Amino acid sequence: MFGISCVYGIMFPLRYEEEISYASETYDVDPVFVASVINSESGFNKDVVSSKGAVGLMQLMPSTAEYLAEKLNYGEYDLKLPEDNINLGTYYLSILLEEFKDETLALCSYNAGPTNVHKWLNNEEYSKDGKTLDVIPFNETKNYVDKCQKAMKYYKHKRNYFAIENF
């Protein structure tokens, strides 16, 4: 019989801790936040490619990765390499967190794009104050945010319980 910790270990795997810690420190993003995005985007499968063409652990679109790499003067990269994918994806998360000043909005933007999030914030049907969302209009994005938040809760608990250094 499988125990609850085994089930959680399957639902919320944790790999590439060194790469996550490095990128998180470099771009000042909570590693738990990064791990939750990776879990939700790819389940920590570095080789996954979506039907829309998003690649790797953080499911970056090649055009987005190219833009990010240019901004960073990153040089050559391979989105299937965990180090490159996590560095570029974490840098993108840092941009979204800086722009929106809110983890939920950053997650919405990572999934649905910043243009959609700005439209939602400017629509009283979705946002009463123009700063937070009362309703996430895309079901896919709402489910994505919920999945990331569940993963964050688990990874925060794991970090505190096991006192994982730099994580």
Task: State where each predicted segment sits.
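Catalytic and substrate-binding regions of cell-wall glycan-acting enzymes that process beta-1,4-linked
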Residues: A106-F162
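Second-shell loop/turn segments in exported
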Residues: C6-I10, I20-A23, K46-V55, N73-P82, ...
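Non-membrane alpha-helical structural segments and their capping/turn regions in soluble enzymes
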Residues: E83-N87, T104, K142
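Residues that scaffold the ATP/ADP-binding catalytic core of kinase and kinase-like folds
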Residues: D47, Y67-A69, W120
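Surface-exposed patches in mature extracellular/periplasmic domains of secreted proteins
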Residues: F33-A35, Y77, F100-S109, Y161-N166
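Export/targeting segments at the very N-terminus of extracytoplasmic proteins
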Residues: M1-K46, E83-D84, R159, N166
